Amino acid sequence: MRIDVIVNTTARRYERAPQLVSELRIASMGRATFHATRDLEELDRACQQAAAAGSELVVLTGGDGSLMAGTTAIARAFGERLPKIGFLPAGTAAIVSKNWGIQGKPHALLSRIFHAGAGLRTDRHPTLRVRAETARGVEERVGFIFGTGLVAKFFELYYEDGARGNAGAARLVARIFAESFVGGSFARRVLDPLPCAIDVDGERLSRDAFSLVCAAVVRDLGLSMRVTYRAGEDPARPHLVVNALPTAKLGPRMFQVLAGKPIGGEGAFDGLVGQFAVRFPARDGEAVSEGPYVLDGDLLSASVVTVSAGPVLLVVKP
């Protein structure tokens, strides 16, 4: 069986400890084709080489964004005949892989994959297909967790704070939650509704601003936030949660999220969907304006984002 191992060397763990990349390279000798990548161009080239060689298993390693970018590049290179996919988490959060039950040190996980050989177990996992219309053209990605509104605004703060992993994210959440009861400026920066229009399966939702827009194919979005508590229920229909509550009403409902229950409230949408689109309004003097969205921790922007079910992956379980 041909195996390709693709490492994102810019992932935080590998930047801090580059010897880990060397360990993976040595472990792959005689067992897999090894690719060390630094950017999307090198990632695309590695996936194209793997596809041309008929690789049966592509192992990705990095953070959640690396998994999203790698899955996107694999889908682009292989088309409908996708290989099995392995993932070795090496980012700050590793949210998707935790939902998949994959945890451990990259070298140990890779060794288990090699030793299992033909006995490797696989699980089927759904994905999102995300099409973004931007000033640069149309961008298509395959990912797992999409969000705008408070999701995008939270990540803006998270990166401003230095992307300090789960501990840093927890501190931000605690401050937002505390301030939401009194309408503090920090909480309002994140929780106040964001102007946008949303079409769900061809029907326009009634509001013109939303505080939360989130769709995912995994249930725990980090820190035990179970916003998309029905994710994965139907691989062809992602779970979409939309809410328009103002800061003072939305913040206190965090307990609903932790319990994996509907947030509720006037103007809310909560269900499985075939497709939805988020359209950001043009600002004064501009024909088209872009708004922020997040896909697997990567902060992006577009004028229109359309989300539907992506390909189902066969993911190896080390």
Give short role names for the model-derived ranges.
Residues 147, 151, 212-229, 299:
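Glycine-rich phosphate/pyrophosphate-binding beta-alpha loops
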Residues 5, 200-207, 224-318:
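ATP/nucleoside-binding phosphotransfer catalytic cores, i.e., glycine-rich phosphate-binding loops
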Residues 34-37, 76-211:
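Catalytic core of DAGKc-family lipid kinases
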Residues 1-61, 66-77, 107-112:
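ATP/NTP phosphate-donor binding region
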